[in-house]
Amino acid sequence: MTKKALFTGSFDPVTNGHLDIIERASYLFDHVYIGLFYNLEKQGYFSIECRKKMLEEAIRQFKNVSVLVAQDRLAVDLAREVGAKYFVRGLRNSQDFDYEANLEFFNKQLADDIETVYLSTSPSLSPISSSRIRELIYFKASVKPFVPKSVVREVEKMSEE
């Protein structure tokens, strides 16, 4: 039986912290789907198309990882559609745990056959968040140490315009 997992997020933009979780999940599961979701609580900085492109470039080396765009639907519905029996969630800190525990409660109510697997972000990457990256971009500070090259290229393109 193939073990499939779904790792969801808005990835606005994808960070090295996200890639850390994706890489480690790729070793644990036969296939990892990255669910690129539109977060109704967040105003998108990069377009969905741009985020998908940056993600696909960043994960190119992982042969068992693919990106799916999913708007206006629940993660449990996407997981069922692709046959994923696991949600992968990254934890940077205790605030992430509180948020994720609440999310897991509702996911279990909707799909009790899907397990949530938590992966702690590597300590050197735990301070990195997409919102901090967007702040650095706004103030024209370098984001190179914190994001994949695909994001750096998009940021450089934006600054040229």
Curated annotation (Swiss-Prot):
Reactions catalysed: (R)-4'-phosphopantetheine + ATP + H(+) = 3'-dephospho-CoA + diphosphate
Source organism of the structure: Streptococcus agalactiae serotype III (strain NEM316)
Positions marked as site (Transition state stabilizer): 18
Annotated GO CC locations: cytoplasm
Keyword Glycosyltransferase tagged: no
Assembly information from the UniProt record: Homohexamer.
Cofactor field: Mg(2+)
SUPFAM superfamilies with a match to the protein in the record: Nucleotidylyl transferase
Record-listed substrate binding positions: 10, 42, 75, 89
Transmembrane segment boundaries: none
Keyword annotations: ATP-binding, Coenzyme A biosynthesis, Cytoplasm, Magnesium, Nucleotide-binding, Nucleotidyltransferase, Transferase
Family in the record: Belongs to the bacterial CoaD family.
Cited InterPro entries: Cyt_trans-like, PPAT, Rossmann-like_a/b/a_fold
Positions that bind ATP: 10-11, 18, 90-92, 100, 125-131
Pathway: Cofactor biosynthesis; coenzyme A biosynthesis; CoA from (R)-pantothenate: step 4/5
Domain of life per record: Bacteria
Record EC number: 2.7.7.3
Subcellular location, record wording: Cytoplasm
Signal peptide boundaries: none
GO biological process entries: coenzyme A biosynthetic process
Protein's name in the database: Phosphopantetheine adenylyltransferase
Reported function: Reversibly transfers an adenylyl group from ATP to 4'-phosphopantetheine, yielding dephospho-CoA (dPCoA) and pyrophosphate.
GO molecular function annotation: ATP binding; pantetheine-phosphate adenylyltransferase activity
